[in-house]
Amino acid sequence: MPVIDFPRKDWALRPYQKELWDYLCAGGRHAECVWHRRAGKDEVALYHTACEMLETPANYWHMLPKGNQVRKAIWEAVNPRTGKRRVDEVFIPELFEKRDTDMLIKCKHNASTWQCIGSDNYEASIGSTPRGIVYSEWALANPSARGYLRPIIAENKGWQIFITTPRGKNHAYSTYQAAVKNPN
């Protein structure tokens, strides 16, 4: 059986991403990441999620503020450095299969799934059991999604990553300040 390098050998963390990556790889369960635009927030979160999918069979979500943003911003987004779709770079065909109609990725060697959804319609997730959620552009998301989904994450001993660009003093500012005060 061939050996598959994952994450890919040609993918490298930027220096400022290393602290977040190390925290997540050490089992960190709550990350607040407020970085500038084009800093690779989603990229780090996608690779972490893919690694988690391979290790722990479960459901994982990547959430943007609006459901109609997800296809453009994540599912069809092309990495300007490589010219490849981000989901194709991260979720390689040797390990994952893609279902375009509902933006779903399945792990080939266990039952893990990853799906893109919008926080504007989090109520539609009734009965779902995500173990990991990335809240992309958290400052623009519906903050009620976090409260609704937090008990599910806790029950599943899961994790949440809140990634965003600064957008003033709003719910993202509040959750970031709370994380600074309680880093554990």
Where would I find each of the regions flagged by the language model?
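Phosphate/NTP-binding elements of NTP-utilizing enzymes
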Residues: 1-184
